[in-house]
Regions:
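Active-site mouth loops of central-metabolism enzymes
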Residues: 1-11, 61-69, 149-160, 214-217, ...
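N-terminal beta1-alpha1-beta2 module of alpha/beta enzyme domains
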Residues: 1-58, 153
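Hydrophobic faces of well-ordered beta-strands that scaffold small-molecule active sites
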Residues: 1-7, 28-30, 55-59, 86-90, ...
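Acidic (Asp/Glu)-rich catalytic clusters
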Residues: 18-22, 44-55, 75-86, 169-170, ...
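Conserved, mostly hydrophobic/aromatic
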Residues: 24, 47, 78, 117, ...
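Glycine-rich, proline-tolerant flexible connector loops at the mouths of alpha/beta enzymes
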Residues: 27-50, 62, 94, 179-180, ...
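Alpha-helix-loop-beta-strand connector modules within alpha/beta enzyme cores
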Residues: 41-58, 113-116, 120, 348-354
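An alpha-helical appendage that flanks or caps ligand/catalytic pockets
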Residues: 103, 107-144, 190-323
């Protein structure tokens, strides 16, 4: 099993990525959330020149953020700096689009986007639609080797629902899933494996990535300690961010625990007060997956963190991740919270025992 990190992209994310490489992590994924974080391709370029072996990927790229030919060029340019170390995770856009008041990209549009990007990277001549015009495009001078089209760039789709899983299976990409617990994530992997069977593929060939958000607790440390709240709290309240917008947007499909419903009701009251009223998303996604906002602090309880994140002692987390590995996940990715970069050492120490 590959052990990797995911970072909330900063222009200097290369520093934590370099440290992760030194500690034995094999991949680093970078957020593509333009209203909250730095550009992933800028950060990945810096990481490419400061590291030697760690694999670098978009985690995950959102199609509407760039034209498909631009994305193909960005990936190939990075591939020149770090040959064979570049990966493309892609999704329909949760945070990146919600932060601008938009819903997810349509799956058919994402499939077309992937077709164009992959075709260009294979040096094919591609039919491409833009602004109602159909054009034939290709890279014009790959022989000059300004970019690297020789080394393959693997693709992964972040998929929570059945249609997204079916698309990943049809295209034969890797699959990225957000982990809350081993039991829940193993069940989702089984659904994904069945999608591969239905697509005529061998489930054993599926490369499944489990992305986990949480905190490695010291023995006796409570789930709502200041450190645990800072590291795991943003991942827990993210579920409330998603569900609070359920009337306007399709949700990720996470279920809020029935016995914790009073916490969500309290959050909905907070959400109702956000201004401007026509753009509540400007508040609800502020600091999203990076920090707790002051009004969220009382809601990030020990039980919420315990139930909605991958938080626990070393022994507990080792058992959870072994269960993911034994079920067929090929990679576990730990979210390194912005401003808490020492998490990379804490997760490395815990993962060393697996």
């Amino acid at each position: 099993m590959d052990f990797v990190i995911t970072v909330a992209t900063a222009a200097d994310s290369w520093k934590v990525v370099k440290r992760a490489e030194e500690l034995g992590f094999t991949y680093a994924w970078f957020y593509d959330t333009q209203m909250l974080n730095a550009d992933p391709f800028v950060a990945m370029a810096a990481a490419a020149v400061h590291t030697r072996t760690i694999q670098l990927g978009t985690g995950v790229l959102v199609p509407s953020n760039r034209l498909a030919p631009v994305t193909a060029n960005c990936l190939a340019s990075l591939n020149k700096l770090a040959p064979g170390r570049i990966h493309c995770g892609i999704g329909t856009g949760f945070t990146a689009r919600r932060a601008m008041g938009l819903g997810a990209v349509k799956l058919d549009d994402m499939a077309e986007y992937i077709r164009v990007v992959q075709g260009l990277l294979r040096q094919e001549m591609i039919e491409w639609d833009y602004a109602g015009q159909r054009r034939t495009i290709r890279f014009l001078n790959p022989e000059l080797e300004l970019i690297n089209l020789a080394d393959a760039i693997p693709f992964y789709i972040s998929a929570f629902g059945p249609r997204g899983k079916a698309l990943a299976a049809r295209l034969g990409t890797g699959w990225i899933y957000g982990v809350r617990s081993a039991a829940q994530s193993v069940a989702q992997l089984q659904v994904m494996q069945q999608a591969w069977r239905e697509a005529g593929r061998d489930p054993g060939a599926l490369y499944a990535v489990a992305q986990g958000s949480g905190c490695v607790l010291a023995d006796g440390e409570p789930y709502d300690s200041p450190r645990a709240k800072a590291q795991a709290g943003p991942g827990a309240v993210m579920v409330m961010h998603d569900l609070a917008e359920a009337e306007e947007r399709r949700t990720l499909g996470y279920r809020f625990p029935d016995d914790l419903q009073p916490l969500f009701e309290a959050f909905k009251e907070i959400y109702a007060q956000y201004t401007p009223s026509h753009a509540k998303y400007l508040q609800v996604h502020r600091w999203h997956l990076m920090r707790l906002r002051p009004e969220e602090e009382p809601l990030a309880t020990a039980e919420l963190i315990k139930r909605l994140t991958l938080t626990g002692t070393k022994q507990h987390l080792q058992e959870e991740i072994r269960a993911l590995r034994d079920a067929g996940y090929a990679q576990f990715a730990a979210h390194i919270r912005y401003g808490h970069e020492t998490m990379v050492e804490e997760w490395a120490e815990m993962l060393a025992g697996i």
